[in-house]
Design a protein with these regions (language model features):
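Short, glycine/acidic-rich beta->alpha junctions
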Residues: 45, 79, 127, 191-195, ...
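Gly/serine-rich nucleotide phosphate-binding loop at the start of the catalytic core
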Residues: 3-71
Length: 222
């Protein structure tokens, strides 16, 4: 019986990190593409498109990366669970500052789900694009990603979707992190998330505003 080939090496720290997820991929090729995506996302290219990532990762076939993202048999949920589990272990119970922010990517056309003409915060203007609400942790001057949720405009809802405001998505992110057992004492967010009426969902998980409605002290303990 022939021995399975080893995955093509990339950057040492990328290889070491991705090895923690290797068992989640059914074959070596899928695992390699997982590593190549990390190399591309960490590179200095301005637009992290699949063709650009394929080029910077070693002149790969962009279609192969597209197949990995769209059709390869791996689970986003399993990957997210593994990542959050590893992060929780690394934190070892330490509290951090939780930052809620939104970001957007400009898109041409409306082929991609939930793309609409809407306000893109990081561009500071209305544009055609997709927006997400993101949760980051800050500890010892290190910023690390936690979770995100795509904002779904009313005009682009799919069958079975329920419209949720950005503050409502923020509440869901906080509650999910609490469910995971992450510990955080302060939530930083844009004033939008503390001043709008639809942010009443913060009530069960916040105690009092600290400043201008953009800082809130919460219980991040399970």
């Amino acid at each position: 019986m022939s021995k399975a080939r080893q995955a093509i090496p990339t950057v040492t720290f990328v290889d070491e990190y991705c090895r923690l997820y290797q068992d989640l991929f059914p074959d070596v090729r899928s695992f390699e593409h997982f590593k190549f995506l990390h190399v591309g996302m960490l590179s200095e290219i301005k637009r992290k498109t699949l063709p650009a990532i394929a080029k910077v990762a070693g002149d790969l076939d962009p279609q192969a990366l597209h197949h990995f993202v769209v059709k390869a048999p791996w689970s986003v949920e399993e990957l997210r669970t593994r990542r959050l589990t590893l992060l929780r272990q690394a934190l070892a119970g330490r509290s951090f500052v939780l930052c809620i922010d939104e970001t957007g990517d400009r898109k041409k056309g409306k082929t991609t789900e939930y793309v609409a003409h809407q306000y893109i915060g990081n561009l500071g203007k209305l544009a055609n694009g997709i927006v997400s609400v993101n949760a980051y942790g800050i500890l010892d001057h290190i910023t690390f990603p936690l979770l995100f949720k795509v904002y779904k405009p009313r005009t682009r809802l799919q069958p079975g979707d329920t419209y949720k405001t950005k503050p409502q998505l923020a509440v869901e992110l906080i509650q999910e992190l609490q469910h995971w057992g992450f510990r955080f004492e302060v939530v930083l967010a844009d004033s939008l998330y503390g001043e709008r009426g639809d942010c009443i969902g913060f009530a069960p998980i916040t105690s009092r505003p600290i400043s201008r409605g953009c800082l809130r002290r919460v219980s991040g303990k399970s």
